[in-house]
Amino acid sequence: MERYIIGMGEALWDCLPEGRKIGGAPANFAYHAGQFGFKSLAISAVGDDQLGHEIREKFDQRGLEYRLETVPYPTGTVQVTLDEKGIPCYEIKENVAWDNIPYSSALEELAKNCKAVCFGSLAQRSQVSRETINRFLDAMPDTDDTYKIFDINLRQHFYCKETIENSFGKCNVLKINDE
């Protein structure tokens, strides 16, 4: 049986000067894995609001399989501006849906059938999503062909030493950007 490649964490809207664009590194990871022909899945949470419905529609249009829990928080957004050098600056909204991804028996079953998962520090800024991500990682098979990819994201104040160290201990692949 083919195992999943999963992006777990934020699914959101990047609000750019030219308009809204679907965003979230884990969701993008799952989408691109699917484009390469892998069985992929995005795991996140959205609000029961227009932006959440539009994320589902976009994922459907792109053929991205997903598990998006509907939670009583607004769908996440990020206000993106460019500095004088053209480098993106991010204002990431807090206490949004992807901060509250609930753990479930369905996620545990997905973890047991997961070949690779990409998770980040950003989605671990809240206790609910951090605990869900850690339980998912712990439920994954511990084999040489299973990959736990940690996408470290040191934006704004949304990280702490304890979460970074814990994630280093759970991952076997580290992704780092220089922006």
Q: What spans do the regions from the language model cover?
A:
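A short, mixed-charge helix-start or loop-turn motif at secondary-structure junctions
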Residues: 12-15, 119
